[in-house]
Amino acid sequence: MRRLAFALLVPFALWGSYASADYRITRDHGGLVDQYKVKYVSIRDRGERVVIDGICNSACTLVLGIVPLNRICVTPRASLGFHMAYFDKSTTGGLKVMSYEGTADVMSYYPNTVKDWLSRHGGLTPDMKKVRNGPELWAIIDPCPDEIF
């Protein structure tokens, strides 16, 4: 009887640990790298979990290099988008000017799974490179348990 009770409780315990994910990304197109660093360091330091449940482009992808990968998962709706860093347009007269130093900085945060994927797809370029749900995304980050979505 005790085994049965334990067996019935385990799925609920696991569900609770993921269902109440502390931070859910659903539609994030990125922004200023330094602001994302501060946000994700804070999430990491509080021990929060992250569920990528939609678009995570540009600076949003820094989450993969700042929050431990074992505290991040992706749902079937997740997609990641990567491109070279560029200077804030407010400082360049509205022009999109690539930042090689910024790109190197962003790359230094990414885990090997991201670096490997980018290497196989030509590295960071001015154009957005997307990876969507499926084996390529799962090679970068684990899928979430079914219970969370």
Language-model segments: residues:
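Sec/Tat signal peptide C-region and signal peptidase I cleavage site
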Residues: 14-22
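Short, basic, helix/turn surface patches
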Residues: 79-84, 101-105
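Bacterial N-terminal signal peptides
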Residues: 7-14
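Bacterial N-terminal signal peptides that target proteins for export
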Residues: 1-6
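Charged, glycine-interspersed solvent-exposed loop segments at helix/strand-loop junctions
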Residues: 23-25, 34, 38-51, 91-149
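Cleft-lining beta-strand/loop regions that shape enzyme active-site pockets
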Residues: 22-78, 84-88
